[in-house]
From Swiss-Prot:
Species: Bacillus licheniformis (strain ATCC 14580 / DSM 13 / JCM 2505 / CCUG 7422 / NBRC 12200 / NCIMB 9375 / NCTC 10341 / NRRL NRS-1264 / Gibson 46)
Pathway: Amino-acid biosynthesis; L-arginine biosynthesis; N(2)-acetyl-L-ornithine from L-glutamate: step 2/4
Coiled-coil segments on the chain, per record: none
Disulfide bonds: none
Catalytic activity: N-acetyl-L-glutamate + ATP = N-acetyl-L-glutamyl 5-phosphate + ADP
Protein name per Swiss-Prot or TrEMBL: Acetylglutamate kinase
Keywords: Amino-acid biosynthesis, Arginine biosynthesis, ATP-binding, Cytoplasm, Kinase, Nucleotide-binding, Transferase
Gene3D superfamilies reported for this sequence: Acetylglutamate kinase-like
EC number: 2.7.2.8
Family statement: Belongs to the acetylglutamate kinase family. ArgB subfamily.
EC class of the enzyme, as a word: transferase
Family matches, as HAMAP family: ArgB
Function: Catalyzes the ATP-dependent phosphorylation of N-acetyl-L-glutamate.
Amino acid sequence: MGKTIVFKCGGSVIRELSDEFFQNLKDLTESGWKIALVHGGGPDITKMLKKLNIRTEFVNGQRKTTKAVLEVAEMVLSGSINKFFVAELTKHGLPAVGVSGKDGGLLLADYLNEKEYGQVGRIKKVNGQMAEALMEKGFIPVIAPLSMTDGCETLNVNADLAASAVAAALRADKLMFVTDVKGIMKNEEMLKELTPEDIESLIAEGVISGGMIPKVHSAKEALTDEVEEVMIVSGKGSFLTKDDFIGTKIIKQKEAVS
């Protein structure tokens, strides 16, 4: 399939993506990269739940998804935020198709723990053919993190884990976690390359803190036999130069220097 890159954009960054970000995507497609996007939508879901007076709670950092919460999550993820993202891509000259993990049986899942988390899934299989077909025709699939069980029940899935699973199924060359910072910083300098061991040391030192901790843990867990390189990049500026990507690269291990 040529070179493939998967981007994961969190719900908090989608509405703040810069023109440079979209131009970078265009540059990548023009140089032969095939692109898939997976997005979240947490802040928009929270706003809509408040608007509709639907109570929600978090268990171990994960939103408990009752049937009422799932209806809202699907409305936001497959509806408003997905179509907003598609429109932004189209506006910047990037042909995009909005889908959810339910379409084409893209994401198949089992219940994570119905008693504790409700309608939340653990991805067990990715059917990448639909996404591959769209990319082969020059479209960017924009994927909302919803899934179906074997019995066709809808389950919400963590967007980071969905992006990781999609990247593995597509055998992507790179998986990019798009954030509001250009990478992981230490003493005002961006760290270019980290291993999982480096990440744990930097967390212990307090260099990586707050909202960046779950991001780096997701990036670290995304490293698999199929996905050997994950990057944390900015959606608020350029993440691409003529020669390379700008961001912090997370790899399994550094090559030995002979």
